[in-house]
Design a protein with these regions (language model features):
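C-terminal segments of enzyme domains that contribute to small-molecule binding surfaces
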Residues: 12, 81-123, 155-204
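Acidic, glycine-centered active-site loop in nucleotide-sugar glycosyltransferases
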Residues: 147, 152-155
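Alpha/beta-hydrolase-fold catalytic nucleophile elbow
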Residues: 63, 136, 152
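Catalytic-loop Lys-Pro-X-Asn motif of eukaryotic-like protein kinases
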Residues: 119, 137, 147
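Short-chain dehydrogenase/reductase
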Residues: 116, 134, 150-151
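Flexible, glycine/small-residue-enriched loop-and-beta-strand segment within the central core
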Residues: 4-13, 18-127
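Conserved catalytic-core motifs of eukaryotic protein kinase domains, centered on the activation segment
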Residues: 72-74, 145, 161-163
Length: 204
């Protein structure tokens, strides 16, 4: 029997889930924290991830200890400390700064379809990772990543393109990530055995 379900996400022990939505066949690794985030179909994260204010496409592969939507502290005020906006934790007569949390929640990170985010990578708010892109382990990503590219480092920069531009564009046009579950199963042998170019020749 298949481990994953179209109806219910597979959420492992010790996770903290806050106001998040999950598509079909989603898996959340043990001890992960997911807040104000949408996970597309077939996407997963491994253990110990911290994901906030993110929009994650389909078939995203997120390794352990990844942080997406890492939150900021105020840089222009007299103090950086979160007593400025988590004030109710420090004084009985002070309220938290709701406007700060609203502004922070609006700064989404976007992760495209069929992406791979390597172990321990950090992706800042308002960054878009294009379809088919790879973020190397330990990278700090502060700028958008083009589709079907591989980036790495602190701060992340281009390592190489996965495919020639024409192939990358054709893969995006094919949008196989929108195929239904039955079709994906029928095409599984070709996903396993064909190069991207041969796959496009057969299905594009």
């Amino acid at each position: 029997m298949a481990k994953l379900s179209a109806e219910t996400p597979h959420i492992h022990d010790g996770c903290q889930i806050t106001q998040s939505e999950f598509g079909a066949f989603v898996e959340i690794g043990a001890g992960s924290r997911v807040a104000h985030t949408v996970f597309g179909d077939y996407s997963y994260c491994d253990r110990g991830c911290d994901i906030a204010n993110a929009r994650i496409g389909k078939f995203s592969n997120i390794a352990s200890a990844v942080r997406i939507g890492a939150t900021d502290h105020p840089l222009t005020t007299a103090s950086l400390h979160h007593f400025l906006y988590r004030s109710a934790s420090y004084w009985d007569d002070a309220e938290d700064d709701a406007s700060w949390f609203t502004a922070r929640a609006a700064r989404h990170a976007f992760i495209g379809h069929d992406t791979w985010i390597g172990h321990g990578a950090l992706i800042k708010p308002e960054v878009t990772i294009g379809h088919g892109a790879v973020v190397a382990s330990g990278s700090v990503v502060t700028k958008d990543v083009a589709p079907y590219t591989i980036v790495g480092g602190n701060t992340a920069s281009l390592i190489r393109r996965r495919f020639p531009d024409a192939v990358a564009e054709a893969m995006t046009e094919l949008a196989w990530w929108d195929w239904d579950h039955a079709r994906l199963r029928s095409v599984l042998p070709d996903f396993r055995s064909l190069s991207a170019e041969a796959f496009l020749e057969k299905y594009a």
